[in-house]
Amino acid sequence: MSDYIVVKCGGSMLNQLNAVFFDCIKKLQQKYKVVIIHGGGPEIDAKLKDCNINVEKRDGLRVTPKEVMDVVQMVLCGSTNKKLVMNLQKHNLLAVGCSGCDGNLLQVQPVSEEIGYVGEVSYVETALLKGLINMGYIPVIAPIGVNGNEIYNINADNAAAGIAAALGAKELIFITDVDGILHEGNLVKETDESEIATFIETGVITGGMIPKVQAALASLKMGVQKISIVNGTKDFTEVTGECIGTTVTKGVSIA
């Protein structure tokens, strides 16, 4: 079993992280090698508004022409990344912030010309991550990548799944503001892609949880073996280092 854990923290969660979250990262780091990937959607939207640039999304992906890509890069690689790095270090967790273009860490395949500079992970330079971890640092990755000489925006879920799959990670943890999937008010501790399809069809999973489980299912298809959906505002780690939340595994494939 791999000793890597990949943690994905969406942009909407970054301002909600408290001391409990950083304590959980400490506990994980005692047993595993931790990599963190973050988003930055709300900050990007705010900066685009300041610049009088239209915000447009298609099928959950940000339409990213050149002028939008410049803002995305500035926000993700600048203030958002460094704020998270500084918060980690404030809690005595040594971290190094970098983006997917540093050292060609995340190489991408463009999604389509219609949505501009948006790519999906095609290759991860894992040696860079392993080197930072072996020196005692937590890599904190901004989800942009490269294709040739061009820089591309990457959906943070796709970046996290690509990194987790490339590292053969034990687990990919999605940090959210809910405890996991709830069924009749009770936490669903374990589920698989077949049961999730049923949950969506019967209305057990609704609203904001749908994109979270869709991201988990996409991660399974990329080769990640185990995904946990946890509440980042609460203690989400057991004494054993296992996560408290909903664990999603592949189970029986959907026909």
Curated annotation (Swiss-Prot):
Residue ranges of coiled coil: none
Residues under site feature: Transition state stabilizer: K8, K212
Top-level lineage group: Bacteria
EC number: 2.7.2.8
Entry keyword set: Amino-acid biosynthesis, Arginine biosynthesis, ATP-binding, Cytoplasm, Kinase, Nucleotide-binding, Transferase
Binding site for substrate: G40, G41, R62, N153
Catalyzed reactions: N-acetyl-L-glutamate + ATP = N-acetyl-L-glutamyl 5-phosphate + ADP
GO cellular component, as recorded: cytoplasm
One GO MF term attached to the UniProt entry: ATP binding
Pfam hit, one: AA_kinase
GO biological process annotation, one example: arginine biosynthetic process via ornithine
Entry-linked InterPro entries: AceGlu_kinase-like_sf, AcgluKinase_fam, ArgB, Asp/Glu/Uridylate_kinase
Places the protein is found: Cytoplasm
Pathway assigned to this chain's UniProt record: Amino-acid biosynthesis; L-arginine biosynthesis; N(2)-acetyl-L-ornithine from L-glutamate: step 2/4
Keyword Nucleotide-binding set for record: yes
Biological role stated in the UniProt entry: Catalyzes the ATP-dependent phosphorylation of N-acetyl-L-glutamate.
Family to which this protein belongs: Belongs to the acetylglutamate kinase family. ArgB subfamily.
Protein name (database record): Acetylglutamate kinase
